[in-house]
Design a protein with these regions (language model features):
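N-terminal anchoring/stem segment of glycosyltransferases
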Residues: 1-67, 80-82, 234, 249-250
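Hydrophobic/aromatic beta-strand patches that form the interior of the parallel beta-sheet core
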Residues: 6, 37, 55, 87-89, ...
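Short glycine-/acidic-enriched loop or helix-start segments at secondary-structure transitions
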Residues: 17, 47-48, 97-100, 163
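Short, polar loop motifs at secondary-structure junctions
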Residues: 38-46, 92-98, 204-206
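GT-A fold catalytic core of metal-dependent nucleotide-sugar glycosyltransferases
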Residues: 71-120
């Protein structure tokens, strides 16, 4: 079984993406062939253990928004890769425990957002602009769950079909022009609202730790992180993390 993991890690997210690949590889105890697709303005391969299977996909983004809006396009670029499943993971996701692939396999897979039954218990953060392709009305009669934009995937053909639809939605909204309330996450929620995922990963059972920026200040603003990458390349064979804006070791 071949599983592809696509990570967007341009600019300040570069060391966080390296951390995700390194720690995913360390804690993964399954039997699938895992290949990482690392979308960035800098090649990460020299900073990672030699045995990790990584393909570098050059991306240049002038802003966080430009980066996050390239998500579907980058996933669609994997069409000719020899993969059975494809998953997207945010670069600032951390891995803190052992896991295998079984818990996340499904035809289409969505992850419940950690705010779904907390801050969004009574009202979801859906896009409410009727002109947008991400629109979900307040009076929808369909079941409501708010999904993460930080993690989704499924069988290759299903994931590519989903991304093709969302890319078309995004392109049409940009002609208005309109940017949905929560960017690409708004399209993901609209898609899953009308096409529920075959498998939902409850937040209580989620194996990863999303939105862990490692204490890097203003991570959405492009800035140099060479003070981190210099440490990473010297210690790439260790189990390392980023906490309090510095590289730490376990």
């Amino acid at each position: 079984m071949n599983i592809g993991i696509l990570i967007l890690a341009t600019n300040t997210y570069l060391p966080l993406g390296m951390r995700l690949v390194s720690r995913f590889h360390h804690f993964y105890k399954g039997n699938a062939n895992i290949k990482f697709y690392f979308c960035s303005n800098q090649n990460p391969i020299a900073y990672l253990k030699d045995e990790i299977d990584v393909k570098f996909i050059f991306n240049m983004h002038e802003s966080w928004l430009e980066g996050t809006n390239s998500k579907f396009k980058n996933l669609l670029s994997l069409e000719n890769e020899d993969l059975d499943y494809i998953y997207y993971m945010d670069a600032d996701t951390n891995v803190l425990q052992e896991f295998d692939e079984e818990w996340m396999l499904g035809d289409t897979v969505g992850a419940q957002h950690f705010n779904d039954q907390d801050l969004q218990k009574d009202e979801k953060a859906y896009d409410r602009n009727p002109k947008s392709k991400a629109y979900i009305p307040f009076d929808t009669e369909l079941p409501q769950m708010y999904y993460h934009g930080a993690f989704f995937g499924g069988k290759k053909s299903n994931l590519l079909e989903m991304c093709q639809t969302m890319q078309e939605w995004q392109d049409q909204d940009q002609l208005i022009p309109y940017e949905p309330a929560v960017n690409d996450e708004s399209y993901i929620n609209a898609y899953f609202h009308y096409n529920p995922p075959a498998k939902v990963l409850p937040y209580s059972d989620f194996k990863f730790w999303p939105s862990d920026g490692g204490g890097i200040p203003s991570k959405r603003n492009p800035q140099s992180t060479s003070y981190l990458t210099k440490e990473i390349i010297k210690n790439k064979d260790k189990l390392w993390d980023i906490q309090d804006n510095r590289v730490t070791y376990e």
